[in-house]
Regions:
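Basic- and aromatic-lined ligand-binding clefts that recognize polyanionic substrates
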Residues: 37-50, 146-198
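Short helices/loops that flank or line small-molecule/ion binding pockets
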Residues: 88-96, 115, 212-221
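A short, structured surface patch at a secondary-structure boundary
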Residues: 37-94, 98-104, 201
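Alpha-helical, coiled-coil/dimerization segments enriched in small aliphatic residues
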Residues: 65-70, 77, 183-210
């Protein structure tokens, strides 16, 4: 398993395990005029929202993942900004007036809270309505409600475009990544596929997903196989599963969608691009 793919897979499993119903968790803003001036992001999804919604002068630092183009769609915009380490000290030393953290950062958050910093938790989103709500909330938090509304409208327009291109009648789909791990129904990508006219295969574990066998995919498989971050060759055991010749033969380009997980882990601009990419990917399936 490559480093980048293992990071993407690990983040997806964490997203599943730490699903939160709300988009934002925080106390009221601590700054006087309602506009934070020194914002640090400690989270991949927060990076992308911050780069999209904040003024450059508001951004003090981003997370270590900010320049990883296998995970983020805003790497070019992230280049000018410093990045923190995976430790509370690197954040505290910057004296931010707002820290955007994720649900996975709780031990670090406890240290940031103890240091008196204002920390907002940016929750993972698992449906499109949450993504729109999150865009509005973060935009307002940063003092730019108009930008948050504009991003929410972009998300809505991308969803509408995908819905207009949806497969009819609906078909079954399984979302599989390295090693045969299949996404369950409680995921953002499943919500995206539902809009596209693709419903989960009954044989795939529900909820947050689980592993599916090669036999299931070949004998009782879906109409469409969605591969997340498919490797080009069988360089390791994880890649061997989804590059298997029988699987390739069963799911040719008319029955397969290849999609980068960077479009399916976060809301915001990543989701806008992901909805558009998925709409384009439906064309060969018709």
């Amino acid at each position: 398993m490559t480093m980048k793919t293992s990071v993407a897979a690990r983040l997806r499993w964490i997203v599943a395990g730490l699903f939160a119903a709300g988009s934002l968790m925080a106390a009221p803003p601590a700054w006087a005029d309602g506009t934070p001036r020194r914002v640090v992001s400690f989270n991949l999804c927060a990076d992308q929202l911050l780069l999209t919604l904040a003024d450059p002068a508001q951004i003090t630092a981003l997370s270590p993942y900010a320049l990883d183009d296998s995970l983020s769609v805003t790497t070019r915009a992230a280049v000018p900004f410093p990045r923190v380490g995976w430790d509370a000290e690197s954040v505290i030393n910057l004296s931010p007036d707002l820290v955007l953290a994720g649900p996975t950062d709780r031990p670090t958050r406890a240290m940031l809270d103890a240091a008196g910093l204002h920390v907002v938790e940016v929750a993972f989103v698992t449906d499109l309505a949450q993504a729109q709500r999150q865009a509005r909330e973060i935009g307002t938090l940063l003092g730019h409600p108009g930008r948050g509304e504009a991003l929410a409208q972009q998300l809505e327009q991308a969803e509408t475009g995908l819905a207009a291109a949806a497969l009819k009648p609906p078909r079954t789909a399984a979302i599989v990544q390295r090693g045969g791990y299949a996404e369950g129904s409680a995921s953002l990508i499943t919500a995206m596929l539902t809009v596209a006219g693709l419903r989960p295969l009954a044989a795939v574990p529900g909820g947050f997903g689980g592993f599916v066998s090669m036999e299931t995919l070949l004998v009782d498989g879906p109409d469409v196989l969605v591969l997340l971050d498919p490797p080009r060759d069988a360089a390791d055991q994880g890649a061997l599963f989804i590059t298997h010749p029988a699987l390739r033969a069963r799911y040719d380009e008319r029955h397969r969608i290849d999609l980068s997980s960077r479009y399916t882990m976060c809301g915001g601009p990543a989701l806008v691009q992901g909805l558009d990419r998925l709409r384009e990917a439906l064309t060969p399936l018709r």
